[in-house]
Amino acid sequence: MFFGINSDIKYLANWINSFVSRKNRWESPKYLIGESYGGTRVMGLSYELQNKHWMYLNGVIMVSPADYKLYNTGNAVYSALNLPYYTATAWYHNALDEDLQKKKLEDILPEAENFTINYLMPALAKGGFINENDKISIAEKYSFFSGLDKKFILNNNLDVPSNYFWKELLKKRGGYTIGRLDSRYRGFDKKVAGSTPENNIELNSWNHSFTPAINYYLRNELNFKTDLKYYVFGPVNPWDRQNDNTRDNLRKAMAQNPFLKVLIQSGYYDGATNYFQAKYTMWQIDPSGRMKDRFYFNAYESGHMMYLRAEDLAKSNDDIRKFISHSLTKGKPAKY
């Protein structure tokens, strides 16, 4: 079976090797693209393909990547990395202080990122031993960048989980909840009170669109007639997440392969795999900093699937084309 991080990677590496051989594409430039969990997958595949199949890639593209090495920590760093996403979402819903709201999003986010790295993370690291005046000061700034009430932030000890944010941000602005995968979407629950939305409102819209489309395509365009259900979301359980070394394996693959470059694409309004977590993952792949010129990062005013917004569909595709043109070897020898 391939229900696990490492078994999934091994299975897909074997499949890719067979495909490349059968289609006689060994001399072709090779790129992997993975979205969400696929980000973990392609990080691991880059190393597996090189070391088990001697297949060297030109590029790895991670779209809204999930980094379970980060998610499983549950520490101060993980918590703090949510704030710039909160800022972007609050800006979209006109929930920020007037001084911030009148600015462009791209001008606000560096301020939120700086506060997160240099003030919020150290404050959370101190836990219950933080000075009370410092705690209040951090809460005030957190409120400024998130649109959340200072008292609410203090009641959560400066550590506001994302599900609380989705429920709380618009509680006093119509009692709406906001989406997880795309926080531009609004919904409402039976009760305005509570700590978690009843459902992911964006999925109701997407499932309503994608399910008829894929079923029509399979039956009418591909002429694949079946009574089997197409699972837009599938119960793939249990999934073995043990021994996840994919982030470091990408570093090893890049160290072995001077031509391997990485592009990361993220949506500002994605609350599942938020853009600042993706940026942090990029920073941590190679702590030495010797390969930082081989990383590219692009963000978009969209959610988890940035290509659902027409402007970002065009821009994200153009960014991939530019990345490919920058990462072609053009006959250079593979050496440092």
Segments predicted by a language model, with ranges:
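Alpha/beta-hydrolase fold catalytic core
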Residues: 127-272
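Glycine-rich nucleophile elbow surrounding the catalytic serine of serine-hydrolase chemistry
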Residues: 34-47
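A catalytic-pocket lid/entrance helix-loop region that shapes and gates access to the active site
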Residues: 46, 50-143
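Short alpha-helix in the alpha/beta-hydrolase fold that links the catalytic acid
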Residues: 44, 260, 274-284
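Cap/lid segment of the alpha/beta-hydrolase catalytic domain
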Residues: 1-22
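Short glycine-rich catalytic loops that host catalytic nucleophiles or stabilize transition states
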Residues: 62, 297-303
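Alpha/beta-hydrolase fold nucleophile elbow
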Residues: 25-37
